[in-house]
Every structure is written in structure tokens, then in C-alpha cells.
Amino acid sequence: VFTPTEGCRVCILTDFDDPAEAMTGLSFLEQEGHEAQKNAFRYFHEGLKNGGHEALGTSGGDLFAHVCTHGSNLDLPDELWNAEGRQLSFDKDIYPNYDIILHIGTYSATAPLTAKCKEFGFRGATMHGMNDVILNSGLAVDYEEVSADAERVRVAMTNADTVEIDFALEDGRVLTASLDLGGQEAQKSHGLCQGKAPDVANLPAGEVYFVPRDANGQFPTKYEDGTLGVLDVVDRDVKRSTLIEGNQATIDAHNARLLDDPMTGTLGELGFGTQVLPVSYQDIQDEKVLGTCHLATGRDDHLGGDIVPEMFKKHENSTHDDILFAPHKTPNFNVKEVRMKRGDQEEVIIENFRPSRYIMDALAAGR
């Protein structure tokens, strides 16, 4: 992923609600939970120390922790703590002093680290929610092959003018969301940060994505408490949510948030998985599965988009929130069909959560 690594200084970042307490004497290792944090320590901090540095030609491997942001891709605080419980500064002590920075925590930090890597020149990766399934599948693959597959799908979809998605609900309704992509070059998340250019990968990788220019229609969503709703999209913005089933208070809270800070409803991404992987129950891997698609609202500057944190009324709202459509995650909705239009060409991309013949042929090409 990070070739060349010779001479690179590496550190590992994670997060806790009380990092000073958790890091002092590494007390979190004796506490319940903290699966991602313990994996960061065991497989990366100790893995580098016990042979990894020698194999890669790297040094460092230090573990640091910051206060958990409780939001996807929110800017990180400047304060963080080392294994002795001593407080340090990201801008003074971390970003200028490490060549490769790995973030393995509760929430994604791809957006803030992407902004900082351009300022300080490091390379890195974010691997939030890392569990044993991810370690043994999405992170245990040949990333040259992941990159090649992502490129095959990217070429098959690049310069798309529009994508339409039909969602079939259990009550028989079919909702359609139409996304205007303006013929833009498709991008890929392929996991490789090779060379010396500053970049931050999102791992596990394997997706093709676009930043929508416009969007209209409706699509369903599933809230964290299991409530199901229909979102109305007008001029790229989610305007309102309507209850399908579950808790009306959840819908009301979302509508209040949309009224209070409309940028939280702006669509910032359309993505398609390109890999065959097992379900991990973490969106970071599951959105990379072939046959799934996802939309995201909010911040998208790390994807080359125009939605930056300063545009939100409240800092805590400047998240990048993925809405994944996958059989295990949204069994109440079927992605009946995804269609791409590119000039005079029209292709089906997904049918009933399965990649279309067009996509399978693209993946088979050049092998």
C-alpha cells in the first residue's frame, strides 16, 4: 500500500472518550470493549515492533489517542495523548514528525487527515471500526489487484452523465433517485498510497465514486434505531424525511436538523463497491462489496467536492455520513436497478443487489 516504506517513520492514532485515562499505562487493554483500539495496539503497534519495522524498513510505531469526535470525518482536536498519558499536539508533535500515519479508531478520519496531509506532506490511512472479519478479509488482500478491479469499474462508469436508482419497498412502492454527474471523471478508492506524494487511503478499499452535481427524487433510509424513512431530494438537498415504520420522533429529529442546518442534507457522494468480501457489519468494508451502492450527505472536500466544514451552522454537523444500501444492512429495501447514462449509451449497473452483466464483463476484461 505504502511502497516505498524504507526510512519512513510511522505512528498509529486511535480515539477514546477519555484518552488521558485510557492511554496511561495502556489501561484500555484491560477494559471491556475498544475492539478497534485493541486491534490497533496488537496488530499495528506491536506488529511493527515485533518484526514489522525490520521487514518494511520503518521506524516509530508509536501509539497516540485523541478524544473521540462522535461523528464521521469531523475535524480532529489538536490535543492527543501518548502511552504515558502525556498531552501532545497534532500540529506540533505528530503531523511534522511522521511520514506514515495510520488512524484506527471509532469513526472515519479520512477528511481531516486528507486536509492535513496536504499541509504537512505525510501519507496515511484510516481504518475505523477494524474488527477480526476486516483484518482477515478486506485488509488481507493484494491491493494491486484491488486497485486494478477498481480501475476496471471506474473506466466502465467514468464520464457518466446521470445515474438513476430504483428502490423497491416492502409495501410495493418503487422510489427513484436521479443523480446528475455532469460527465465527470469517476474516482476510485483503491487503497494504494505509493510514492512520496501526500495522500490518505480509506481501508479496506475498493469502490468507484462520484460527487453529484445535482440530485432529485426519493430514496429510503434506515436510521440507527431501526426506523425506516423516505427522504425527498430536491436540487441535491435532502429536504424532508417521512416515516415508513418505526419511531416518528426519529423522523422529527432529522427534519429539525435539516431545517436548522440545511447543509447536513446535501448529497456529497455516490459510490459503488468493486470487491467480493464477506459482510463485516462495518460500513467501511461493507460499502466496498460488489453489488452495493451508497449515498453520502455532508462534507465532501476530501473527495474533491465543494462542501467544507465552514459551510455548516454547527461544527458537530460537518460530518460525512454514508447511507449504505446492502442486503444485510437494508433488507427492507431492494436496489431493484441502477442505470447509468453516458451520452447515447445506457447501461444497467446493479440489478437486485447484484452486479450487472455490463459490470461483470468490465471486471473480466484484460485478465
Q: What positions do the PLM features span?
A:
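A short, compositionally biased
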Residues: A156-V163, D237-K239, T330-E337
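Active-site bordering "gate/hinge" segments
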Residues: V1-Q218, Y223-G226, R339-R367
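Structured core elements
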Residues: C11, P220, D232, H294-A296
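Dual-mode signal for accessory low-complexity, basic/Gly-rich regions
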Residues: R240-P309
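Active-site lining segments that contact anionic ligands and/or coordinate catalytic metals
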Residues: G7, N216, L228, V238, ...
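Oxyanion-binding "anion nests"
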Residues: V208-A253
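Internal helix-turn-beta structural module
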Residues: L295, D300-G366
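A generic structural signal for short, non-catalytic loop/turn and secondary-structure boundary residues
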Residues: T158, G172, P212-D214, M263-G265, ...
